[in-house]
């Protein structure tokens, strides 16, 4: 949901590169990386921006199960506009993903870890998560990528935005 909202606010990152044109999308069809026997597949949460968190969670669980069981239909894994890879659930704190062409970008999500931070001049402990964004610079420039990361960070730091 956070990526879909970010793409709505930063539409220059919801694009794909082709030999003929840069394609721009109005919907956020989010591909999620799922490990399967012998490789990886990226089923799609279609129009994720129009769905609530509970619906997205249920769809992600269902699609991951179908992926692992080898029961995905082509329309369930073809045509995504942006990808997410989450190795954080395996305790990996930081990693780089490879762009799922022709998509313009992929967000790598690392594990949340407790770290010391300084807030208002005082030392405290906070859960900190590392993300890495890889973009195809033929269709997404560095300024747009930086704006995406800034927007995504802001949404995660104010998660009530996901409820609106």
Set out the residue ranges of the language-model regions.
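C-terminal catalytic/motor cores of large multi-domain enzyme assemblies
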Residues: 1-164
């Amino acid at each position: 949901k956070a990526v879909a909202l970010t793409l709505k606010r930063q539409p220059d990152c919801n694009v794909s590169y082709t030999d003929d044109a840069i394609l721009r999308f109005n919907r956020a069809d989010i591909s999620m990386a799922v490990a399967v026997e012998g490789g990886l597949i990226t089923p799609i949460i279609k129009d994720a921006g129009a769905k609530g968190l509970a619906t997205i969670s249920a769809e992600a669980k269902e699609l991951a199960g179908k992926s692992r069981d080898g029961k995905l239909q082509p329309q369930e894994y073809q045509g995504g506009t942006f990808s997410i890879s989450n190795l954080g659930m395996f305790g990996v704190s930081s990693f780089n993903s490879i762009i799922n062409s022709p998509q313009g970008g992929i967000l790598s999500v690392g594990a949340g870890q407790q770290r010391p931070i300084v807030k208002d001049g005082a030392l405290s402990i906070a859960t900190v998560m590392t993300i890495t964004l890889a973009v195809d610079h033929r269709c997404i420039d560095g300024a747009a990528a930086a704006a995406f990361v800034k927007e995504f960070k802001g949404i995660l730091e104010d998660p009530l935005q996901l409820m609106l």
